[in-house]
Amino acid sequence: MGKIQELSPELINQIAAGEVIESAHSVVKELMENSMDAGATQMDIESKDGGLSLLRITDNGSGIDPEDIEPALKRHATSKIRDYGDLENVLSYGFRGEALASIASVSRLTLESGIKNQKTAWKICSIGGKISEKEEIPGFVGTKILVEELFFNTPVRRKFLKSVRSEDKKIRDRVTTQALARHDVRFRLFQDGKEVFVLPSRENKKDRIVDLFGENFRDHLLEVSLERGGLNATGYISDPDFYKSNRTGQFVFVNGRPVEIKYGSTLLKKAYDELLPPNGHPYCFLFFEIDPSRVDVNVHPAKKEIRFLDEEGFNGFFLTLIQKELRSSTPVSFLELKKRLLRPTPETFKTSSLYQAHSSSRSGESPLLSRELFTEVPRQEGFDLDRMGPGASLSALTDNVVKHSSFVPKKHFGVLFETFILAEAEDGFYIIDQHTAHERIRYEEVLRKLEKKNYGIQPLLTPIRIDVSKQEQEDILNRKKEYEEVGIFLDPLGEDSVVLREIPAYMEPGEEKEIILDFLNRTEGKETTEPELYDLMAKCVACRSAIKKGDHLSDPILAEILNRLSYCENPSRCPHGRPTLVKLSRDDLERMFHRK
C-alpha cells in the first residue's frame, strides 16, 4: 500500500473543526450566527462547565425544512450560495457550510428543528460526525441545538483549553458582541443553571449598550455617523474623559458581522490624538455598511478578520468618522490648548464601573492651566513626609532590604525641568526621573508587604460604592477570595454594584478607588496566580501613589528618594520597564570633552 492515502470524511471534518472551532465560545458564535440568518428574534444560550459538558442554543427562527435536516450536518452544504457570484455578495453570517459539520465532528450533537404550518418537527443525533438517530417529534417553529462533550474524541484539544471560568468569560463576551450587533433580538444567557443576563429587544443601539455596560455610560457616549463613497457608518464613541486601560471596550461591525479591522485600534488612537493619555483606550461601538463586493470576509476561517478592496480609503473614512464628532463635541479652543499642554498622569476616576473610564485631569485642577499660558508660575509647595501618606512615606528603611552596590549616591545638585534629579554617585554622574524612581521604590515596598502579608487593614469612615454591571459583579464575586489575598474586600450591593468598606494599609486614603479600579481592569478576564496578583497590585499602587512629573521636592525628600532607590533590587527600571536613571561615568564625560 502506498504511503499517501486519502483522508476519511470524519478526519477531514475534525481537521476543519480545528480551524473553525477553537473552543466552546466558537461553537456559540457559529450557532448564534445561524440563528440570526434564520431570522430569529429570540435566543436562549445555555452552557455548563464552560460549554465543554453542554451547550444549548434555542431560537424562534424559521427552522430547517425536513429534507434539509440531514444535509445540514454535512461539510460544505449551505443554503446561502450556489455560485461564486453569490459568494461575492453574501450578507449572511454563516455561508460556508462548515460550522455544523465541524461542531458535529468533535461532539455529541442533537439538532431539533421545525417550520411553520407543520404538525411535526424533526430530530437528528450525531456522534463524532456520524448520524446515529433521526426521528419525527411534535411540531414547533425554530431550532434547538444541543452540543455535549465537546472535543470528546480529540482529547489533545480539550487539554489545551483554559479553565472553566475563562471559557465562561469567553462565552459571555461572544454573546455580548452578538447582542451589540442585533439590538432588535432578545437574548438570554444561562451558565451552570444561573441566569447571567436577559436582554430585551431594543429600538436603538444606545439602549442595548446601556443594558450591557451600565446606565452611567449613557451620558458619556458620542453618536457618530458618516456616509461617503458607498460607505455608511453609525455608532457611538466615548468622550475623551471616558476610557479604559485596555482595548476590551472596542467593538466594530461590518455588514452586521463582528470583525477585527487591521490597524483599527491604531486608527482609533490616532483619531483621539492627544485627547487621551498614552495608556488610555476609548470605547467604541461602530457599525459599517458597505457593498459586499468591496470587502472580503473570507480571509479567516472563523470570519473574524476582513479585508477591504480600498484599505487606504477605508482608513481615511474611519478617521474622519471619529474626528468629525470629537471636533464638534469639544470646543476648538480646548482642542488647540490640549495639544500644547503637558498631560498630567490621571489621578482620579470619574466613574466606577469596570467598563468605565478614567478622568484625564487632576481633581480640583483646571486642565487649561499651563506654564505656556503664563510668564510666571507660582512655585508649588514642596513635598513633605506627611503629605505622602503612610504608604508612600520615605521614613525609616525596613531591616530586611540590602543596599544595591551599583548605585550609591553621594550628593545631589537639584532637579532639572521639574522632573530629573541630578546626582553624583561613587561610579559617575546620574540623571534620575523622579516619577519612575519613586514608582520603583513604592513597587518594591508594596510587593514586600504583600509577599510577607505584612500589612494591616483599615476601615473606611465612608464606604465606597462601585457601580458595575450584573455580569461584572458576578466576575468580581467569583474572584472574591483572590482579591482578599491582596487586602481588597468587596461585597455585593444590589445587583449592579459592589461596596468597599476597608482597605489595606499600604494604600493611601483618598487614592484607593482609582487603585482598585485600575487593579480590577488589569485582572479582568485573566487567569492569575498569587504572585501575579501581588505584582499587579504593587504596580497599580506604585503608579497611582508615586511622585509626579512637575511636583516640587524639597532637598531632604530628594536625598531620601536617592537613598531609597539605592536599596531597590532593580533601581534602574520602573515596574513597567521604563528607565529610572541614566548614568554618565567620569570616562564618558572625559571622552565627550575630548580629554581622552
Swiss-Prot record:
GO terms for molecular function: ATP binding; ATP hydrolysis activity; ATP-dependent DNA damage sensor activity; mismatched DNA binding. GO terms for biological process: mismatch repair. The keyword DNA damage applies. It comes from the Bacteria. The keyword DNA repair applies. Keywords: DNA damage, DNA repair. It holds the Pfam family DNA_mis_repair. One of its GO terms (cellular component) is mismatch repair complex. SUPFAM superfamilies: ATPase domain of HSP90 chaperone/DNA topoisomerase II/histidine kinase, DNA mismatch repair protein MutL, Ribosomal protein S5 domain 2-like. This protein is involved in the repair of mismatches in DNA. It is required for dam-dependent methyl-directed DNA mismatch repair. May act as a 'molecular matchmaker', a protein that promotes the formation of a stable complex between two or more DNA-binding proteins in an ATP-dependent manner without itself being part of a final effector complex. PANTHER family: DNA MISMATCH REPAIR PROTEIN MLH, PMS, MUTL, DNA MISMATCH REPAIR PROTEIN MLH1. This is DNA mismatch repair protein MutL. It comes from Leptospira borgpetersenii serovar Hardjo-bovis (strain L550).
